[in-house]
Regions:
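N-terminal alpha/beta PP-like core and its mobile active-site loop of ThDP/TPP-dependent enzymes
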Residues: 2-283
């Protein structure tokens, strides 16, 4: 990316914008707020393709020691964030520039949506001062992403950056997990505000956690059915892995000596050669 390109609508270059950032500890830019908020949510890596609308986020990530994985296509970045979330159980994060950067990532976000994967998609946008004026790569990202995310919104002020990231991250884990989209206009990212005017939620604050406990009587009845069955079999699906219940599931299968079939993300928790691993028969 050429950081010396003029910003949309004239004005300073991207490199000039960064050079003008205050060094005072009493103020902070929107991009640095993004990085601090991501750090508070446990994010240690972002997947992205470098773009002018989001450059200040990179500056903040460097200061917060958040790893930047710069790929060659935004679809790859979205799929990588999805894969990261599935393997770690933590929040995956993809950052894209405005317009085609956002739309290129849609297939990966749609995959995360159907797979119930907690992915936060942060997207750039033209400046608020140029809203509806045909600024560079301006698209209705929030409306486009709404059908394939659990939460889709735009940050309209720098002071709200951190708490809206916390809100979007919370939605990724509330109930059935899934992706959230947060659009942040360029001037919101570049603007500096007083640290005292910023709301910085505590790490994981208000993070909902729901677990299906089940009725004890039903669980006891199910156990009796399994023990008394003549030819039982168990089908294990994706939630066994996403809920990190695979160790208990394997212990159950082996303790009761019951064959198990695996679907979705549960495939692989037992190796194909295991005596309790049964292959499906398709016609």
């Amino acid at each position: 990316m050429n950081t010396n390109t003029k910003l949309a609508g004239g004005g300073d270059t991207a490199s000039d914008t960064l050079a003008q950032k205050s060094k005072s500890e009493g103020v902070i830019s929107g991009g640095h707020l993004v990085a601090k908020a991501l750090k508070a949510e446990g994010v240690d890596t972002i997947f992205t393709l470098c773009g002018g609308h989001i450059i200040d986020i990179y500056d903040g990530c460097l200061d917060e020691n958040i790893r930047i994985v710069d790929v060659r296509h935004e679809q790859v970045a979205a799929h990588a964030a999805d894969g990261y979330a599935r393997q770690t159980g933590r929040l995956g994060c993809v950052v894209t520039t405005a317009g085609p950067g956002c739309t290129n990532a849609m297939t990966g976000i749609a995959t995360a949506f159907r797979s119930e994967s907690p992915v936060l998609h942060i997207g750039g946008q033209g400046a608020l001062t140029q809203h509806k004026m045909g600024s560079l790569q301006d698209l209705p990202h929030v409306d486009i992403l709404a059908p394939i995310t659990k939460f889709s919104a735009s940050v309209r002020s720098t002071e709200r950056v951190a708490d809206m990231i916390a809100m979007a991250a919370r939605e990724c884990f509330a109930g059935a997990p899934g992706p959230s989209y947060l659009e942040i206009p360029r001037d919101v990212l570049d603007r500096e505000v007083k640290v005292d005017d910023v709301t910085m939620p505590a790490p994981g604050q208000y993070r909902g956690s729901t677990h299906s406990l089940g009725d004890p009587a039903d669980i006891e009845r199910l156990a009796q059915i399994l023990v008394q069955a003549e030819r039982p079999a168990i089908l294990l699906g994706s939630q066994v892995w996403s809920a990190r219940g695979h160790t208990e599931a394997i212990a159950l299968v082996r303790a009761l000596n019951i064959p198990a079939y695996f679907n979705g993300a549960a495939r692989g928790i037992l190796p194909p050669g295991d005596p309790h691993h049964f292959h499906r028969t398709r016609r």
